[in-house]
Amino acid sequence: MNRLRRSDGEQTYAAILETAVRLASIEGLSTLTLGRLAEEAGVSKSGLYAHFGSKQQLELDIIQAARDIFEREVIQPALAADEGLPQLEQICASYLSYIERRVFPGGCFFAGMLAEFDARSGTAAHDAVASDQQGWTELLESFAAVARERGQLKRSTDVPQLVFDLTAAVELANYYHVLFGNPKVLDRARTAIDTAIAANRP
């Protein structure tokens, strides 16, 4: 019976988080109130407190849930590719696919969080989002560095600059795709990615 209750509790927690991530991707994380989430998830505010304890913990759990989805949709396909340039190309392709399929209804969750929390230093949510963005940059740089070491890119390739260019392409595609709903921006991003990589091929 205790195990059944824990299972029910875990299912409720997962369902609440699914709703919370969806709402946060559209409406923002900091503005998501417990009352709004309780209404949308069909639970009481006291029930939410039983699962999260505080607004800060709710925010951190939402970020973790979104992180898990992002890793599954974008990072894992890249890690499964051959090392070096194939991984760099795959992670860009996976990101654009994840945008195109609207895995999060409000577009890339983390791009939205960057815009929301970039100037709100000192909060746990800001620190978590900043850490994720740094980790994302370092991952792409590691793929590009291996590609350079293996001769897939020029030895003169400026890895941080290349990654900056690729990140700019995919993140701008995300913003424009959400704002205008025009799938052509994804093709423009693919062209920008191909051009940036081609300029660094040996």
Set out the residue ranges of the language-model regions:
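C-terminal peripheral helix-coil segments that are non-catalytic and often amphipathic
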Residues: 1-3, 90-98, 134-150, 169-172, ...
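Basic, helix-initiating cap at the start of DNA-binding domains
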Residues: 1-27, 31-40, 57-60
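Hydrophobic alpha-helical connector segments
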Residues: 61, 75-106, 159-166
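Short hydrophobic/aromatic patch on the recognition helix
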Residues: 41-52
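Hydrophobic alpha-helical segments that form the core
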Residues: 106, 111, 155-176, 191-196
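Amphipathic alpha-helical packing segments from all-alpha helical-bundle domains
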Residues: 71, 105, 122-149, 161-164
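Amphipathic alpha-helical segments used for helix-helix packing
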Residues: 87, 101-124
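Amphipathic alpha-helical segments enriched in hydrophobic/aromatic and basic residues
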Residues: 24-27, 33-34, 45, 55, ...
